[in-house]
Amino acid sequence: MERTFVMVKPDGVQRGLVGDVIRRFEAKGFKLVGLKLVSVSRELAEQHYGVHRERPFFGSLVEFIISVPVVAMVWEGKGAIAAARKIIGATNPLEAEPGTIRGDFGVDIGRNLIHGSDGPDTAASEIALWFSESELANWEPATKAWLYE
């Protein structure tokens, strides 16, 4: 099964949307294997968003992510990365489809509520950056037989 990293950003935490995010991933049939509330250090934020280091918004993005705790999660399931991207919606909430997290709750690209890994390599590196192996639970949900052939 594939794993992906998902983070509810400060705006999602402040707006009380963590439960809605978790509910959508659980309803899709994904298994939660890692979950924690994190007060993000500047170093961690800069590592996570390192790909944007040369972009003009990098500084404000780092300040935003360290401003309030975030909820970091690892979800597991068949096609988890691509499915998570669909559940999350387009980066710009104004372009996100209704029924997606950003489409239903987002109003501004700078406050787009949630981050999700964009591919297998990114997922692996983000999971390793945010979680130690001992923080990830290996378990089998009772619903597995009802989800997969």
UniProtKB/Swiss-Prot annotation:
Cofactor: Mg(2+)
GO molecular function: ATP binding; metal ion binding; nucleoside diphosphate kinase activity
Pathway the protein contributes to: Purine metabolism
Subcellular localization, as worded in the UniProt entry: Cytoplasm
One example of a Gene Ontology biological process annotation: UTP biosynthetic process
Residues annotated as binding ATP: K9, F57, R85, T91, R102, N112
CDD domains: NDPk_I
Main location as per UniProt: cytoplasm
EC id: 2.7.4.6
Broad class of enzyme this protein falls into: transferase
Recorded GO CC terms: cytoplasm
Catalysis performed (reactions): dZDP + ATP = dZTP + ADP; a 2'-deoxyribonucleoside 5'-diphosphate + ATP = a 2'-deoxyribonucleoside 5'-triphosphate + ADP; a ribonucleoside 5'-diphosphate + ATP = a ribonucleoside 5'-triphosphate + ADP
Keywords: ATP-binding, Cytoplasm, Kinase, Magnesium, Metal-binding, Nucleotide metabolism, Nucleotide-binding, Phosphoprotein, Transferase
Annotated family: Belongs to the NDK family.
Summary of subunit composition and partner proteins: Homotetramer.
HAMAP family reported in the protein's UniProt record: NDP_kinase
Full protein name: Nucleoside diphosphate kinase
Organism listed in the record: Picosynechococcus sp. (strain ATCC 27264 / PCC 7002 / PR-6) (Agmenellum quadruplicatum)
